[in-house]
From Swiss-Prot:
Disulfide bonds: none annotated. The keyword Magnesium applies. PANTHER family: LYSINE--TRNA LIGASE, CHLOROPLASTIC_MITOCHONDRIAL (PTHR42918:SF15), LYSYL-TRNA SYNTHETASE (PTHR42918). The gene is lysS. It comes from the Bacteria. GO terms for molecular function: ATP binding; lysine-tRNA ligase activity; magnesium ion binding; tRNA binding. This is Lysine--tRNA ligase.
Amino acid sequence: MNADPLETDAALPEQFRIRRDKRARLLAEGRDPYPVAIERTHTLAEVRAAYPDLATDSATDDIVGIAGRVIFARNSGKLCFATLQDGDGTNLQVMISLNKVGSETLDAWKVDVDLGDIVYVHGNVISSRSGELSVLADSWQMVSKSLRPLPVAHKEMSEESRVRQRYVDLIVCPQVRIVAHQRIAVIRAIRTALERRGFLEVETPMLQTLAGGAAARPFVTHSNALDIDLYLRIAPELFLKRCIVGGFDKVFELNRVFRNEGADSTHSPEFSMLETYQTYGTYDDSAVVTREIIQEVADEAIGTRQLQMPDDSVYDIDGEWETIQMYPSLSAVLGEEITPQTSVDRLRAIADRLGRGIGPEILDKPSYGHGRLVEQLWEYTVGNTLSAPTFVKDFPVETTPLTRQHRSIPGVTEKWDLYLRGVELATGYSELNDPVVQRERFGQQVRAAAAEEDEAMALDEEFLAALEYAMPPCTGTGMGIDRLLMSLTGLSIRETVLFPIVRPHSN
């Protein structure tokens, strides 16, 4: 029989052992430190809302039952003070007085309660002599005994600890709670904005037999039931287009996607993605909708379109946004004309001139053709400099296999990327719906894979079969929710996700 580590581990911190012993004593005395339920009548926020202007040093006859986490406590001889915190961050003072509860109940509070405990307090609403809205207890109860002490201050937590113990971070840092609620508001506002425009939300497979819809390396798993390898999806695109073939007019999906690639301040292997598809629209139409939705989301989740960053800089996302074209903007910064006809040798010569600090991927990838070279050069010379919201449009054909060729400009496709603060935030297409051309594009990708191109898209015969039933012209967009919140707040991707992936502690 395995020994209980709580009973045998002498290396436990002293505070842990003290609190564990209190738990054991409460149980021995018949006082459950983890009761199944309590009779809470009000949240802390409801108490504050009900008594906004209670006069200093006054009392009411109103009785409430409240619960919260003890984040501050001060014990004196005949009167104890504590600050309780609710899940939304609301604080409220409670007072335990000898005259009100008697010596036994007061002494139990002093002995049993530690910072971090969740307690229930029953009593009447008053205002203290200092004017602090409070609940004067006539009884109290332990609701959940905390065996681990909270950090004294947020600064005590390292960045790694904040990520690993986000639950503690949420307790001690108000800004973390604010960002978590902003994320909820962002997702709610996106759904509301799309539904108001007639979009229907659908669900498509997370597990797929082919990894398609984007150029990315997938996570691979195996189905024991089917005895085949499956892939965590890298994008929902190809299934959403099947919905368009089947007759949906406007669809969207907001859910998780997975890419087995690097993790840094702007990338995560698992992230939330919004994709939308609208029939009989072009990439110009989807750019307008994307701008409007982001502005509406800022209104709802942040409360302003003047985005205040942690470094005190301000980004204005109101009004119309600038639009530039990839080839002309790259030509302007390089000082020479770059077109879809510019040779690979010339592009590599430019990369060599710029140096490894500008384009390491270019120098280390001999398989890169014209399109990848142009995109990499543009990203390093133009994209990273775009602070204000900017649409860059008209991409090389070979890097956009699912996109319609431009109506009037040879060698480019009708695609835009949206940049804000130097980060790609969203992308939009006039979708390719010619099944013959789509098959040719997939063939080019397969050949790229044969040339050791890690991010080539697989040939999806089932998707091609769907296109052969005729898909109406449409426009599609994709936007990372994590990056949207990054753009709205100026935070890193790990700070916008409640529980980002971290390497587990070794034993």
